[in-house]
């Protein structure tokens, strides 16, 4: 199939998805848990793909994604709170320093740029480390930035340890899908470009990549900065979804969740990260919720079912996946337009072959 036909089929698939989501919003009540899964899943898909760009395609083991999401969330919130609401939000800091509000699209881009700037400054010394040392350094950065943003000395900007609120949010599931979809498409274009091939060469063998003329540090920091940019955008989307921002929400556990999503989906697979994001959110927010509720059947209380047991079961499931199916759902494969068309045509091809054989007899 040529590129033109692939593009046409891709556009048709995207249009069909958005029509389906539009009809879904008109059919189901706004409180349906399905919308929670779709909204949060779309946001986590973006941050998982951004982490996969580092871990899966460049071979850099980073654990700082929650820190960059925090920067993006705060940047978006700070620059979009309406001036008339700032006295309520910054009530302990005389209305704060910033007294203007940016449009939502501009603030989303600014959130990514702020995270990218921090990534560049942190990456200059940190990316000279490798393996576990890099992971520890980036995890340390995420924890430090979380503490700094809660510092009361920065209260006129960050509101200290208090909530940021009253900034623009979204209610439609179409918004996070549109923003995340656009960002993921840009990441895919990057992966398929000459820069993406350089990232993969670094992942496979740094010595061989350097021998081929690839500037290792330049491409590593480029991958780190771009990944952080999209993590910042996803942080802004998460702030819009949650309607409030507080630094204490961006703990190391958030990075571990994102890393698990990447591992479950398949390290080096964009579509794997997207699929596992929705599965992860569906399990943690919806399907396994009953495990947290105490259940009594005919006077007998079912053992273990109490608050927190859901996370235990979910952890066991993840351990089984990591131990017995290490490649994840997709491995390093992708769901392509060609593959989907072949999958759809397969039953019809078998039926036609059976009819042809019967006619020949």
Regions found by a protein language model. Name each.
Residues 1-361:
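Transmembrane alpha-helices and adjacent helix-loop boundaries
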């Amino acid at each position: 199939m040529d590129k033109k036909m692939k593009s046409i089929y891709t556009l048709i698939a995207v249009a069909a998805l958005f029509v389906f989501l539009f009809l879904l919003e008109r059919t189901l009540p706004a409180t349906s848990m399905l919308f929670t899964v779709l909204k949060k899943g779309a946001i986590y898909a973006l941050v998982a793909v951004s982490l996969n760009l580092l871990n899966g395609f460049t071979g850099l083991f980073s654990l700082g994604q929650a820190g960059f999401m925090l920067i993006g969330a705060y940047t978006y919130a700070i620059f979009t709170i309406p001036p008339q609401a700032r006295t309520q939000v910054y009530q302990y800091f005389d209305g704060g320093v910033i007294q203007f509000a940016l449009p939502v699209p501009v603030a989303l881009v600014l959130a990514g740029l702020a995270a990218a700037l921090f990534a560049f400054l942190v990456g200059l010394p940190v990316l000279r480390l490798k393996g576990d040392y890099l992971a520890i350094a980036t995890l340390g950065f995420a924890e430090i930035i979380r503490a700094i943003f809660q510092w009361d000395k920065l209260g006129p900007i960050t509101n200290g340890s208090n909530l940021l609120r009253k900034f623009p949010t979204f209610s439609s599931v179409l918004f996070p899908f549109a923003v995340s979809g656009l960002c993921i498409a840009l990441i895919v274009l990057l992966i398929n470009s000459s820069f993406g091939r350089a990232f993969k060469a670094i992942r496979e063998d740094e010595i061989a990549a350097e021998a081929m003329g690839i500037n290792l540090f330049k491409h590593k920091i480029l991958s780190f900065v771009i990944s952080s940019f999209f993590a910042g955008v996803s942080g802004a989307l998460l702030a819009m979804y949650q309607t409030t921002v507080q630094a204490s929400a961006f703990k190391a556990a958030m990075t571990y969740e994102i890393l698990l999503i990447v591992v479950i989906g398949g390290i080096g697979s964009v579509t794997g990260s997207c699929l596992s994001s929705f599965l992860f959110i569906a399990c943690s927010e919806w399907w396994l919720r009953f495990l947290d509720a105490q259940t009594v059947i005919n006077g007998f209380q079912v053992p273990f079912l109490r608050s927190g047991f859901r996370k235990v079961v979910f952890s066991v499931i993840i351990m089984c996946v990591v131990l017995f199916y290490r490649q994840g759902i997709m491995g390093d494969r992708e769901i392509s337009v060609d593959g989907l068309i072949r999958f759809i045509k397969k039953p019809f091809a078998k039926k036609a072959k059976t009819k042809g054989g019967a006619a020949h007899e």
